[in-house]
């Protein structure tokens, strides 16, 4: 029997989500505004299998599987880069119909070595390394093709992976569309000061005066690798304070990074600035340039109308280049927000419904969830 979202059946959740949305069209773009937020996620679930995978270069990745071992395979790509997977990420998938794989990317979460240890070298942590890691994990688990779910940085990584290995991706489910291009790094670290001037000045003033007119991500990266623990700790706190400023639409949103323990702040700040200082190890414009490789991969892009961390133009340009991708803009969301979650769950349930229908056609005797 198909598991139900918390306190609601699957069909009821879809009906409730639909009733919460006011839909109106502008051209080909459907905008959805949620009157209020209801938790449509599935109940908390624990993994039924975990492990560590040696991927070379001295790195071992933590991975876990939850849900139905015979369900539709899906892999979750977390954000950051460097944030690691969280238990809530498991809850967007129907555990009766999905085989969900989560893993912590290099130097993140429970993978080793961890970036929160200041002596750890990040040189073997690049986008091409992560793409190879995804393939190694897929092969290790004996999965032929899988749905790729990515949020924020996970969108960038998921697109890069899908463009490199389209034959291994059945669908793309992307939330908070981002770009690895340097203009977006410049926007987040400098131009966004027009939106949050007081907070940005504090952020800018966290680096030496001689570096304040240059690449702020690179300047912070240098501070975060300082031999002085006090310098590292202050830089990590300043970076995380700035991240918390712009990732939420709600002015009274509860901070997350800025109140994390110092080692966790250091870990994510080191990895993020390492990537941003190197253009995310991708060519400028690469993901749009190679979007033709996504042909025949269906998917969804869920984006907040007021996402200042990733302006809507990024998702809009991708939607024009990816003909099989559906763009849904959530009117009450920023870079994250509860209004985005029911849209994503609705899509994931549609994908599972299609799989069940296809299997019933080819195997009429099969039962639900097979």
PLM feature segments, named:
Residues 128-146:
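Conserved acidic catalytic loop of the alpha/beta-hydrolase fold
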Residues 144-183:
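Conserved hydrolase catalytic core segment
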Residues 308-314:
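Conserved alpha/beta-hydrolase "acid-adjacent" motif
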Residues 39-60, 272:
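N-terminal cap/lid segment of alpha/beta-hydrolase-fold proteins
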Residues 294-295, 301-303:
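Short beta-strand/loop motif that positions the catalytic acidic residue
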Residues 169-219:
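A catalytic-pocket lid/entrance helix-loop region that shapes and gates access to the active site
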